[in-house]
Amino acid sequence: MSDSKLAGQFFDAAIGLLTRVRDEESDSIAAAGAAVADTVASGGRLFAFGAGHSSLAAQDVVYRAGGLALMNLLTVPGAVGVDVMPATLGSALERVDGLASAVLDSSPATAGDLLVIVSLSGRNALPVEMAQNARALGLKVIGLTSVAYAENTRSRHASGGFLRDHCDIVLDSKIAIGDAELTAPGVEAPFAPASTVVTSAIMQAMLAAAVEQLVARGIEPPMLRSGNVDGGHEWNGRVMTEYRDRIFYRH
């Protein structure tokens, strides 16, 4: 069986995007890593949020083998979309004004903490208001988004602003509008989205930069090990006990 031409093209597209992000966003990723390290060093808590498929990159850094134990998932019931029926409910919730405020008010997030918001378009009410309200509460906000949307589409928030307009640090995923890398004869719509690959890589790169910063400051990063290696559960238990006041996925 011959190799798939389109499969190879997708890999090329994803690698190209990752290379571009590495080359063009290195300063921003380093700044985001430093902000995470600052929060860890000062006793703050870390949170990640994403709606729809953007939630995948947020989920990937929570309770993760090889990840920072202090990263907590900020959730909005139904906003992931694929976990509810109909799945389109998730898209609708992203456009509801006031929802972000209710979520933050009922969360443990407080001044001095840090929130990473992942939103590909950054144009809907939920991520925009999440950033606005988080900063008003005194959180440091990192936005992971595609700046192309802010430059080429209209905001769906009453303010006319995008996620990038309300963040302390912006990480640009470089994903094209529509999030589909390939076209082919006989296929009426573009296909093969790469946003999950790229945004997850950016999140991991940011945390790697944070680990580097912590070590440089003489602080041992609170890391988790895989539960599928010998001693992993015991290691994680010790870490979670030591940092139990900053870890909320165990409560």
From Swiss-Prot:
Any one biological process term the GO annotation gives: carbohydrate derivative metabolic process
Designated name of the protein: UPF0309 protein SGR_3073
SUPFAM superfamilies named in the record: SIS domain
Origin species: Streptomyces griseus subsp. griseus (strain JCM 4626 / CBS 651.72 / NBRC 13350 / KCC S-0626 / ISP 5235)
Limits of the SIS domain: 36-221
Protein family per UniProt: Belongs to the UPF0309 family.
GO molecular function: carbohydrate derivative binding
